[in-house]
Amino acid sequence: MAKKKSEEHSGTDANDSDYQEEPNFDDPPGFVDNISDEDLLGDMLAQRPSEADGVESVVVVDNIPKVEPVRLEKLKLVINKLFSNYGEIVNVVYPVDEEGKTKGYAFMEYKQARQAEEAVKKLNNHRLDKNHTFAVNLFTDFQKYENIPEKWEPPTVQTFKVQSDLYNFINDPDTYDQYCVAAETAPNCVQVGFWQNVLPEPFELETRERFTDTFVKWSPLGTYVVTFHKPGVAIWGGSSFQKIQKFPHPGTQFVEFSPCENYLVTYGPTPTGQKIIIWDIRTGAEKRSFVADGMSVLSMFRWSHDDKFVARMGENSIHIYETPSFYLLDLKSIKIPGIRGFSWSPTDNVIAYWVEEQNQIPARVTLMEIPKKREIRNKNLFHVADCKLHWQKSGDYLCVKVDRYSKLKKDKKDLDVKFLGMFYNFEIFHMREKEIPVDSVEIRELILAFAWEPVGNKFSIIHGETNSSNVSFYEVNKGVKPSLVKRLEKKSCTHLFWSPRGQFIVMANLTMGTFEFVDSTNDYIITASPDHFRASEVEWDPTGRYVVTGVSSWKVKEDTGFNMYTFQGRIIKRTILKNFVQFLWRPRPPTLLSEEKQKEIKKNLKKYYAAFEQKDRLRLTRASKELLEKRSQLRETFMEYRNKRIAEWAEQKSRRIMLRGHVDTDNLETDEVDEEIVEFLVKEEVTLLE
């Protein structure tokens, strides 16, 4: 064919001397090709579609209980209930032996192949009971394993990626804290800056454009910062905040870290409700997932302080899962009829929960020890409308705020319940005392806020009318009823923010943007009353030395930014930042020093004062020197620019004279200058004479 084509071409254009005859690629007569199609086109043949044999939607379930015919129906109900959660099952086969006893495996056919794949993914290694753990595989996997090549090829060696020190932020010799500031630069585009709170001016560590779509969140110990994106979330850390791990969960709206930072919980919407996934942070592996109905609220999981257990509330039950397997504790839920709420102790494996009133049975608050599931304390309550559980951070006390009523009004069908004559009780459980005694404080006014002192024995309450409320401080001591130590009257605050170290508290009105700083040691003196109009957030730093108030663009669009104060309310810094979103201090891990060592340091603290003061003076001197040098450099730059412009102006003098009719206007004197003296009041002082 090539030769014929060249002949035709040469016949039509014999004068084309540049034309070269094409080579002949025809095989010689009798040629036999010894290369197979698999060797020649193996990569393409591997992708060719194969004829479906109808078993893609079949799964094989191994390690099921071997039961007699009389128990087979019950077994089918249990297994069908599990596997039907992932799709419609069209056929099930349980092979049996000669005696009719099941052989320990079964075949299940789903309506669609993707349903079978989902069932394998979710139920493989599912623990049915202590003696039976499912091994679930696709039927087509047998064919895949049959075709394993006999010649083993070693896996390619992956280079080891050295991870930077995740705890370098606590190695600063001066122990300066870090914080992050987020600001929206475009829709779904948030810039995040990381700063170190050094003196006299904060130092910028890193700034990332388009770092997150919405907001960021620190992990409890400050090791990681999490960012939100359409495909899922990612965590960052190290000295330069490089990516540590990513977790694919589209549409994630909220995340929770476990207290020891071993696990991450992501919450994302689905057409039928919320999908919740628990991840292993170090490996990025999905440990377990849940689908909650649309009525479920965020943060439905509660972690124990040591990451050994995670719990969630179900209908008339608590589900407690053990880590790292995430199987139910003792393979069953704890049945608690009428349960309405629960909470873990922040320092011990103790769960507090409360049960509503039912059929003339009083409401009840119970403390349960885990994993023994032993009830260590009960408290019956009457005429209860609602309860809130408040643990003190040190785990020494539990306060149960009880909303009580004098009269209950129901309609004919009991669909609408109204509580009349409301009053409130605070039940204080002394967790460190023998038999856990309980004290009660009753208040007849509306309760607006409650807050424990994190490391002390005091708690504070806002009660009364919204615009003219009272703030009461109570002290809890062993063997005596909680005593009222101070009441600040006619305050317009809505929230209470204790310092992480105790003693100081900020009473905030997050509607008006007013704040009062109170020292709870010296007769509860108000040390300062600054204003920050429209402020919607208050953040204490981990050391309790600084407080930040912020006006977020989520609330308003003008005058957004943040103010920084000392713990006594003295303003340090005002920052106006367009489209400011959030300010977050970086948390610190707990100290490695023992309590005895900490007490020794506090006892001998005066020895360190001289060294600290000298260091502060040197720092301020150095800062003053740097400031003077900076000002001097700015002055030199300005004078250089000024002299340059003066010389340029002098060079243009002849041009100016020519343009102005040969009149030198530079030296003309004029009487058209008017001087006006304006006086205004700067300050007025009034002195009373006796």
From Swiss-Prot:
Compartments reported by the entry: Cytoplasm
Segments of skewed composition (Basic and acidic residues): 1-11
Start and end residues of each stretch annotated as Disordered: 1-33
InterPro entries to which the protein is assigned, alphabetical: EIF3B, eIF3B_RRM, Nucleotide-bd_a/b_plait_sf, RBD_domain_sf, RRM_dom, TIF_beta_prop-like, WD40/YVTN_repeat-like_dom_sf
Highest taxon listed in the record's lineage: Eukaryota
Classification via Pfam families: eIF2A (PF08662), RRM_1 (PF00076)
Acidic residues bias: start-end ranges: 15-25
GO cellular component: cytosol; eukaryotic 43S preinitiation complex; eukaryotic 48S preinitiation complex; eukaryotic translation initiation factor 3 complex
Intervals holding WD repeats: 207-246, 293-331, 334-369, 442-484, 530-575
Example GO molecular function: mRNA binding
Record GO biological process: follicle cell of egg chamber development; formation of cytoplasmic translation initiation complex; regulation of translational initiation; translational initiation
RRM domain mapped to chain residues: 57-141
Main localization, broad class: cytoplasm
Metal-binding is among the record's keywords: no
CDD domains: RRM_eIF3B (cd12278)
Keywords: Coiled coil, Cytoplasm, Initiation factor, Protein biosynthesis, Repeat, RNA-binding, WD repeat
Protein role: RNA-binding component of the eukaryotic translation initiation factor 3 (eIF-3) complex, which is involved in protein synthesis of a specialized repertoire of mRNAs and, together with other initiation factors, stimulates binding of mRNA and methionyl-tRNAi to the 40S ribosome. The eIF-3 complex specifically targets and initiates translation of a subset of mRNAs involved in cell proliferation.
Subunit: Component of the eukaryotic translation initiation factor 3 (eIF-3) complex. The eIF-3 complex interacts with pix. Interacts with mxt.
Family classification: Belongs to the eIF-3 subunit B family.
Protein's name in the database: Eukaryotic translation initiation factor 3 subunit B
Lineage of origin: Eukaryota, Metazoa, Ecdysozoa, Arthropoda, Hexapoda
Encoding gene (name): eIF3b
